[in-house]
Amino acid sequence: MSWQTYVDDHLMCDIEGTGHHLSSAAILGFDGSVWAQSPNFPKFKAEEITNIMKDFDEPGHLAPTGLFLAGTKYMVIQGEPGAVIRGKKGPGGITIKKTAQALIFGVYEEPVTPGQCNMVVEKIGDYLVDQGY
């Protein structure tokens, strides 16, 4: 299965039969290289990925300044140190799951809930971890 298929079929899927979808999603390498992304995934800056990686290595690094993706600031909320970073901005937010080799991004807006985004991103992330990625 191609990386793009994971994004198209597993990240940008209909969530729990609600007819709702994430706003955008991507799978990136630790260096910020794009393995696959939805057409509207934001154009991020390399230093934003560097800061996200630093937060995985040093949990809490992003808390004082916020998480930035394509210049959009998200308030960092409870995650799983070294494994998941979650951010909130108004009625939407972001979930980032770190696997052995990749970062799985899911960005959402209402009516998608934070819990639904977490479920979608972390489910595919856990699957990729189990597959050695």
Curated annotation (Swiss-Prot):
Tissue-by-tissue expression: Ubiquitous.
InterPro entries in the cross-refs: PFN, PFN_euk, PFN_sf, Profilin_CS
UniProt xrefs under PROSITE patterns: PROFILIN (PS00414)
Domain of life: Eukaryota
Keywords: Actin-binding, Cytoplasm, Cytoskeleton
Function: Binds to actin and affects the structure of the cytoskeleton. At high concentrations, profilin prevents the polymerization of actin, whereas it enhances it at low concentrations. By binding to PIP2, it inhibits the formation of IP3 and DG.
The protein, known as: Profilin-1
Organism listed in the record: Solanum lycopersicum
